[in-house]
Amino acid sequence: MSSKRAKAKTTKKRPQRATSNVFAMFDQSQIQEFKEAFNMIDQNRDGFIDKEDLHDMLASLGKNPTDEYLEGMMNEAPGPINFTMFLTMFGEKLNGTDPEDVIRNAFACFDEEASGFIHEDHLRELLTTMGDRFTDEEVDEMYREAPIDKKGNFNYVEFTRILKHGAKDKDD
């Protein structure tokens, strides 16, 4: 029996925790639908979606996926796919944005004092002259609802939170 346990430990990686509260991204009915979908895919009912679960689910739909295809799907997750990871992955796909820490770290590259702020003029210059260049109109649109203080400092930590979770009500 102990040899079975040892073997199980070597084949399963420990699930990573999501960096943000993914359950806040969806209402209860959406979470319930995702849970039902997760349970339909988790064919062996072990609480994780693995390659075999994906194969069995796709086969039940009349598909015959290749091993490479299944590996590609599994590699989209940073670890074992439990329900929280499943919800996180779907949330990011549905919202079409990168994880919160990736966005925040992209801004942090230009925050020389690690303060959580970048002056709006400096950020405008960066956004309009580097990489996939923004137009001034696009920067203006971004700044319209952005957390910028009276000194012109753009709070990218708060902006990232708003981007991923929505703005707080003005009454809060």
UniProtKB/Swiss-Prot annotation:
CDD domains named in the record: EFh (cd00051)
Name of this protein: Myosin regulatory light polypeptide 9
Lineage: Eukaryota, Metazoa, Chordata, Craniata, Vertebrata
Function summary: Myosin regulatory subunit that plays an important role in regulation of both smooth muscle and nonmuscle cell contractile activity via its phosphorylation. Implicated in cytokinesis, receptor capping, and cell locomotion. In myoblasts, regulates PIEZO1-dependent cortical actomyosin assembly involved in myotube formation.
Residues modified to Phosphothreonine: T19
PANTHER family: MYOSIN REGULATORY LIGHT CHAIN 2
Binding site for Ca(2+): D42, N44, D46, D53
Comp. bias intervals (Basic residues): 1-16
UniProt keyword list: Acetylation, Calcium, Cytoplasm, Cytoskeleton, Metal-binding, Motor protein, Muscle protein, Myosin, Phosphoprotein, Repeat
Record domain EF-hand: where: 29-64, 98-133, 134-169
